[in-house]
Amino acid sequence: MNLYTRLINKDHPLPPDYVPENLTDIGIPFDAPCGDPKRLLEIRTAHAALMLIQAAQRESLILTGISGYRSYKRQQQLCIGHSNPASSTPYQQISPAPVNPYVALPGTSEHQSGLALDVSCPAVNHELITEFAETPEGKWLVRNASLYGFI
C-alpha cells in the first residue's frame, strides 16, 4: 500500500520517525512565515493545493494555508497543549480520547503524511473555526476540493 491509499487513524498510526521524503513549500499563500515546517506538503499534494487555490482566486476567493505537514513531535506538543495544562505528561498517557476531537493523537494525523492541508480565509480572520463553512470560500471548497484530490 502506498502513502496515497494508506489509512491513517488511531488503529493505523504512522510510526514516530515517519517523515515524507518529498516535502516542499510550493509558495501558496500561507498564514506562516517562509521556513515554517507547516508550509510543507508532499510534492503532489503541494501541486494540487496550488491548483485549488489558483482556481479559487479565479473566482475572487481567497484561501490561505494554515497547516500542512506536522511532525509526530509537533503533534505531541499540540496534544499536550489540549490536555491538562498543569501536567507535563504526554497527552496519550493522560487520555485515550482527545479532549478536543479535532486534535489527533501523535501518529494518527494525516498532517504527518504531508497529504493534509488546513485552509481558511480572511472572512474568519484565517482561523480554523466552523464558521468557515458558511463563507463563500468554505462553500466553494465543499463543491471543488474533490476535483483536486482533497476529501
Locations of the language-model features?
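Extracytoplasmic cell-surface/polysaccharide-interacting catalytic and binding patches
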Residues: 1-68, 72-151
